Amino acid sequence: MKAVGLVVEYNPFHNGHLYHAQTAKLQTGCDTAVAVMSGHFLQRGEPAVVSKWARTKMALQSGVDLVIELPYLYAVQKADIFARGSVSILNELECEALFFGSENGDIKPFLETAQLIDEHKHILNDRIKEELKKGASYPAAAAIAFSSILHTESALDLSKPNNILGYQYVTSILTGGYPMKPYTTARISSDYHDADLPEGENHIASATSIRKAMIGQNLEACLRFLPAASARELAAYRKSFGLWHTPESYFSYLKYSLSTVTARELQQVYEVEEGLEHRIIRSIRKSSSYQEFMELLKTKRYTWTRLQRMNTHILTRTKKQDMQKLLDNDKAPYIRLLGMTKKGQAYLSEKKKALSVPLVSKLSSFSHPALDLDVKASRIYSLPIEEPLRTEFDLQEYGHAPIRYDEDEQHFLNV
């Protein structure tokens, strides 16, 4: 059996993701798709609109064979750390290929750019430091530095979110010396951050536009952009727990957290840098919504995404020293299995004896500081759910066995 790795969030799983999973197998010649998926909080610092279990069920019904959780340690991070953790898991599972979406669908510029940047990394680092001193945000500083050496027509456009992540995946493969071949395909139809559902006959929409419509209480308008399985799981989650999760859902908890912490304590939280703790405390006192808080907090130096990640770390009280200690390791400390098809189970049985890190199926069987972070993030995620459903949700984190799906008979075996 041969596997292709996918790094995903599935927030939610839509037709573009279905195309991605199908094309990954076709273009690479692999028969098994392994998805490393962010858990309850995502790379941009947002909560997933529905739980990782609901999103796993969507994926297993739509061509993905194994779903592995990307630990919080890597999931709520800037692109290079996010990619490093994801790729290390795919390598541990002996994926022969990594497949990702990009703007143009050509892998050559990614490989050339990675080599060029590696050759000029000292110049780049110096230029980034210069731009940061001028007050630029890190992404803006990096973009200026990259443009100073990437000045050919064939150079990779690193202003595009998918290209940035793709570049980091390729860099992680090369830096790690992993025997994994990167492939890419062009994104189809909808732009990554399109805020509105497209009109006409198009059946591909951005996850951003789908979430916006869902949160506006209009799931029906999203149906043509979703596989039937995703529509079912979204409706079932809403019926079971009574909400879609949004950043605004957590504002009262964030405000409480910031009302009970000192500036000195806040300064110890991961990604709270350079005196930002004072601005945070001043801004939260004046804010009556998450949107208002973010608008007061945002500056030229700190992007919305960076601040959202910081807010999530405040909610989870993740400290700099704890995170840094965990990040000192080059690879993920465990593999947390969320779900599998029959084919995925066969692939895992073939590979698990060679794993150099523990395979975690149930939390009761394993303990690790990084896993403690995952559990804490899950408990924070459940806060907007009303009791007694919240306690029921929290207990799932410990008692939920990996979801098993029979792709031949098209039904779940244990849910």
UniProtKB/Swiss-Prot annotation:
Coiled coil: none annotated. Changing residue 134 to A: No change in activity. Its EC number is 6.3.4.-. Keywords: ATP-binding, Cytoplasm, Ligase, Nucleotide-binding, RNA-binding, tRNA processing, tRNA-binding. It catalyses: cytidine(34) in elongator tRNA(Met) + acetate + ATP = N(4)-acetylcytidine(34) in elongator tRNA(Met) + AMP + diphosphate. The keyword tRNA-binding applies. GO terms for biological process: tRNA modification. Changing residue 187 to A: Almost loss of activity. GO terms for molecular function: ATP binding; ligase activity, forming carbon-nitrogen bonds; tRNA binding. Belongs to the TmcAL family. This is tRNA(Met) cytidine acetate ligase. It comes from Bacillus subtilis (strain 168).
